[in-house]
A protein has these predicted regions:
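Active-site beta-to-alpha loop of glycosyltransferases that engages the nucleotide-sugar donor
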Residues: 179-190, 201
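Cell-envelope/extracellular polymer assembly enzymes that use nucleotide-activated donors
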Residues: 94, 173-178, 205
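A recurrent flexible, glycine/aromatic-enriched loop bordering the glycosyltransferase active site
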Residues: 45-75, 87-88
Length: 207
């Protein structure tokens, strides 16, 4: 359709321009991603838009917030060997994690460049559409932790298609508790009392 054709042209132009700008500034240009939107019938009438943050590695451990549109160098794809069949269902999440192990980051293009049609069998329609997605995502995350030399257990998050890494605690690291407080003495006293009476961790400081 003409609408789809316009989207393709805008994708190519906007991403190409972003890559050139990154190169001019001397910044990495190996991996870029954009915002996206979901639609049911007409691409001109999106239901909801996903406006994403700039590169957030901790957030990516919780969910595949990058999703679409993603652009990366062909050489990186070939170096990684493409997608892994064992992560089918969450192959994009797995690929992004492996790409970022090489690039160290990704550039966010803050424009809606991808439009995803929602239907009953798609992952955009809800996590229940493909139950095996969660298992694949947890494998992708667990493998990523192993490759990056970190230890922890990947668990389901509070919401569908979200995950939590329960990190292994090595030794007794010091925990710094920052309490933003101004002219609220009673609230501060309650907070401090709660910390001192409920925590089981002894090595901490309150700032």
């Amino acid at each position: 359709s003409s609408a789809a054709s316009d989207v393709y042209k805008r994708q190519l132009y906007t991403m190409g321009k972003a890559i050139l700008q990154l190169r001019q500034r001397g910044e990495p240009d190996g991996f870029l991603y954009s915002d996206e939107a979901l639609f049911a019938k007409s691409i001109r009438r999106p239901m909801v838009a996903h406006f994403k943050p700039d590169y957030a590695p901790d957030y990516l451990l919780c969910c595949n917030y990058i999703c679409h549109l993603a652009v990366f160098k062909k050489a990186l794809w070939e170096q990684l060997g493409g997608e892994r069949p064992e992560c089918d269902g969450s192959q994009d999440h797995d690929l992004f994690l492996r790409l970022l192990e090489k690039t160290g980051g990704a550039a966010h293009v803050p424009q809606v460049l991808y439009y995803w049609r929602v239907h009953a069998g798609s992952t955009s329609g809800g996590a229940d559409a493909k139950p095996y997605v969660a298992a694949a995502a947890k494998k992708a995350l667990a493998d990523h932790l192993t490759r990056t030399g970190r230890t922890g257990t990947v668990e389901d998050g509070l919401f569908p298609s979200t995950y939590r890494v329960k990190w292994d605690i090595v030794g007794e690291p010091k925990v710094s508790i920052l309490i933003p407080n101004k002219d609220h003495t009673e609230d501060l006293e309650k907070c401090l009392h709660s910390i001192w009476t409920k925590t089981e961790w002894e090595h901490f400081e309150v700032i």
